[in-house]
Amino acid sequence: GRASEVLYYDARGNEQAQRAKAVIVCGNGAETPRLLLMSASDQQPDGLANSSGFVGRNLMFNNHAFVNAVFEKPLNDYKGVQVTRIIHDFYENDEARGFYGGGGIDVRALWSATPILHSELGMPPDVPSWGAAWKDEIAHNFTRQLSIVGGTTSLALDSNNITLDPENTDEHGRPSIRVTYLDHDDDLAMAQFLEDRAMELAEAAGAVKAWRGGVGPTTWSAHLLGTCRMGDDPATSVVDRDHRSHDVPNLFVCDGSSFVTSGRGQPTMTIMALAFRAADRIKAAAAAGDI
């Protein structure tokens, strides 16, 4: 079947319907599978576009390691471009490490992008969260601090997924998201490797103080990937190489959920590139009467 309309809630909380010749879903790796799973019907009882059973599966969080460093003189890293320095020396997999994975290291303001963010997430572990010492640290170190960030592999695991919560609902009574996630041991080992290299870089650069963010189970992410994977085989993927659903020919998914692997760094530019590519393919299909 084909998608014919989208139901949504307006600003007053009233349900509305929008007819459409084509539907493009861009809700990221969490809200996109949630929407498709909530759109189950008699024709597609396991969720819209989910004949493969892969909607919501293989969630990837884009693993990272962090080191913060303070220097003697101001860096003013909060000004201008956020990321200007990138290292790819450790990008490729190296069997000599004893685990799978790779990644890049970039240097950026990150927690020192704004004073408020710095006070929340950029403080050294020995500084209290309030009082004179807290104020002194912000006043002196905000312009002198930078973060060294290692972006590494997050392996696609069938056990990591987005499902509909059977108990909790949102304000409209719709099922909330349930997230199930546990890092692969190799992902954590690679993150530890990059954290160690980041500490070496901070020390070699002359940091007067440096501390680790700490490597452990991933409990948050800005990058939600993999839950509506792209592929040629409808039995093992949700969308084809043009981001078109295998099951619903006028439904497209254009966000990080189409990733089959996490990559080894920031995914945003890849998501943007795929979105431009998908737009060209959708335009061509529409012109050919194929939507």
Which residues make up each language-model segment?
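A glycine-rich dinucleotide-binding beta-alpha-beta segment and adjacent secondary-structure elements
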Residues: 143-154, 158-159, 174-262, 268
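A conserved short coil-to-beta-strand element within the FAD-binding core of flavoproteins
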Residues: 1-4
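A residue-level signal for conserved active-site and pocket-lining positions in enzyme catalytic cores
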Residues: 59, 164, 198, 230, ...
